[in-house]
Amino acid sequence: MTLTNPFIQSALERIDSPEVIGVGIVGSYARGQEMKYSDVDFDIFVSRLPEDPYDRYTLRYWDDKLISLKYTLFDDERAALTNPRRAIWAVPGLRQMKTVLDKDGSMAALQKAAHEFDWSLLQPAADEFAAEEVMGNAEEVHKILSGLAREHESTVLYATWWLVKNMLEAVAVQRGLMIISENRYFDLIQDSVGRDSAWTRAFRTAWGLDPNSSQYQARGAAALTVYCLTASMFDKLIPEKHRKVVDKTLQLIKDAEI
């Protein structure tokens, strides 16, 4: 981390208050991977959030650096370690964090908990989340099918965005992928599923990463393929209460012959 002590101390003087429990630097500066345009991310752990919601996350320019200030309830961050959807982000973030203020040892204890984190305890909840996402996104499939049938570009693109975004998260959470950086999110998921897999090829087309996927029809069709392959990936996790919705949705995709 190349930030100078005077800079850090100056920042802490502006940040500190009676509600602050501790402060950590996260992101590229914590990992030693900062570049020319990197901002400095301060996670500020507090006992009470600022009253104005806009003050809970804000940006500033200090000493010619873009500063990100994110206020988080300390107890809420600890609770994130028990939620699979949040843990894939919280655990690596806490492990990498460089603590610059720890008033009572709470920050050290939180980082220790992150280093001792056991994903296996959350796997059942992660499986349930993935199954719920497959079921819940049947609505987006219907929207894509409707948009394609009506040749309505905006409908297809909006539903494609939501469907693919949610299938990505389902895979990341179910597989317990530790997101070491938001810049690696798409890389980590594609690497996990397989760069040459049908799922990844469909994702890249749906997301517009394929040079031949500029047309909304191709992207919508690829998003439907992502859904089918994700449903197949998690087939054994889908409970009976969701089976009819998922199976009917898969049949609609098949019948559409897109």
Which residue ranges define each predicted feature?
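Conserved short hydrophobic patches within well-ordered secondary structure
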Residues: V20-G22, L110-A113, M167-V171
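Conserved NTP/Mg2+-binding pocket subregion across the NTase superfamily
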Residues: L3-T4, T58-H152
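Glycine-centered flexibility motif
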Residues: G32, R56, M97, Y227-D235
